[in-house]
């Protein structure tokens, strides 16, 4: 029997100040989600900074026009489609068939990804539509390279594909989100963060 204990600090503001800000003359922090209710205050507080520090904040409007460049569709069925692998697979298949564009499907479960991938492969049969499914044997760079090379490719991803994937323009035109990735509420770290948020002024 082997037992291991793991610890993680909830508040790392002091570490950031001592090891990052005070050891560097210039630090640039960027994100699309830094502001809360049009204020940088919460981000500054959580990251060891105050209004008294020599800070310059800037807010830039995104040049991306959602109204002109995005069409949003939501499944309107009466049940949770993720509970029916066959129906979910049919929906993904028909969406890809309708648009016939490079499509990425994001999952929160590896098992669901594998099950749907198997069903889609059966539906595709001999069609020349490449399907790249994230698995233990496929690397992220090789999957992205495959998307570059095939105009109507299907990409099934989870975990690392939820962020840090750059497929601009025609390299990715259809995105299907099977289920939003919420953290497990019972996770000790998540519970600690939640308590901290509720007790913060």
Describe each region flagged by the PLM.
Residues 1-200:
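ASCE RecA-like P-loop NTPase motor cores
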């Amino acid at each position: 029997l082997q037992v291991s204990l793991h610890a993680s600090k909830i508040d790392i503001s002091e570490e950031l100040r001592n090891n990052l800000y005070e050891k560097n003359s210039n630090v640039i922090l960027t994100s699309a989600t830094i502001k809360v209710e049009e204020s940088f205050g919460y981000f500054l507080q959580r990251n060891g900074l105050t209004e008294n520090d020599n800070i310059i904040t800037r807010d830039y409007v995104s040049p991306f026009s959602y109204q002109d460049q995005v069409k949003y569709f939501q499944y309107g069925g009466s049940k949770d489609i993720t509970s029916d692998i066959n129906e979910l697979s049919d929906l993904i298949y028909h969406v890809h068939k309708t648009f016939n564009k490079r499509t990425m499907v994001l999952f929160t479960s590896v098992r669901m990804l594998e099950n749907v991938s198997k069903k889609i492969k059966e539906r595709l049969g001999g069609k020349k539509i490449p399907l790249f499914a994230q698995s233990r044997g496929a690397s992220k760079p090789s999957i992205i390279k495959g998307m570059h090379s095939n105009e109507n490719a299907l990409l099934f991803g989870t975990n690392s594909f939820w962020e840090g994937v750059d497929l601009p323009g025609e390299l990715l035109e259809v995105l299907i989100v099977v289920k939003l990735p919420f953290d497990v509420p019972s996770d000790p770290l998540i519970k600690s963060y939640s308590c901290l948020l509720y007790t913060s002024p």
